[in-house]
Amino acid sequence: TLLEMKKKMLGLIEELNPESELLTDDPDIAAKINDVINMKLFELARMKKIPKYVEFEVNEGELIDYTRIEQESGSEVYQISLVEGVAYEFKAQGTIIKALESGTMGIDFFVYPERITETTKAKGYEFELTPDALEIMPYGVAGDLLKSDKSSSYGNVYSVQYENMKRELDPRYNMSSITIEGGVSI
C-alpha cells in the first residue's frame, strides 16, 4: 500500500514519525512526497509495464482508439500490446485499431498507474507494480527527496543505489513478440 511505501522510504532516510498523521515532522518532505512517489511510479511503470486485457464486440470498419479501450476497461492506456479475435490493422502509429471484420476483439495492453493525489487514502491505495519494482522504489524516492539537501550526500547515495537496482529489474514484460498470420510465400 501507499502507507507501507511511505513508511519504508521515511524509515530509510530516518525521517519516520509513526505518531504524526503525515508520518514525518519535516514539512518539506511531507509536501513533496506524493509528487516524488508519482514520478518514480510512472518511471518504473514505463520499464515494468502494467498489463491489462479487455474484450468487446466490434463491427467491420469500426475504428477503436484509446478512449474506447479506456471506457471498456476503466484504465488509462499506455500502449497496445496485442490484438486478437478479429482481423485488424493499426492506424495512426498504433494508436487506433481498424476492425476489418465484425466479432469479439481481445486487446492486451499496458496501462498507466493510478496517480496519487492529495485525496488518495494511504491505507487504501494499492500499487500495481511488480514486487521487484516496488522494492527499489523507496531508494528512488529517497534520492529525489534528499537531492536538494546540500548538507549531506544521502540523496546521491540513494540515487546511485536506485539506478544500480533499476538495471537489475526483471525485463519479462519488456520482451517483444511477433505474430505471423496467414503464412509466408517463398
What are these regions (language model features)?
Residues T1-I186:
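Glycine-enriched, solvent-exposed interface loops adjoining structured elements
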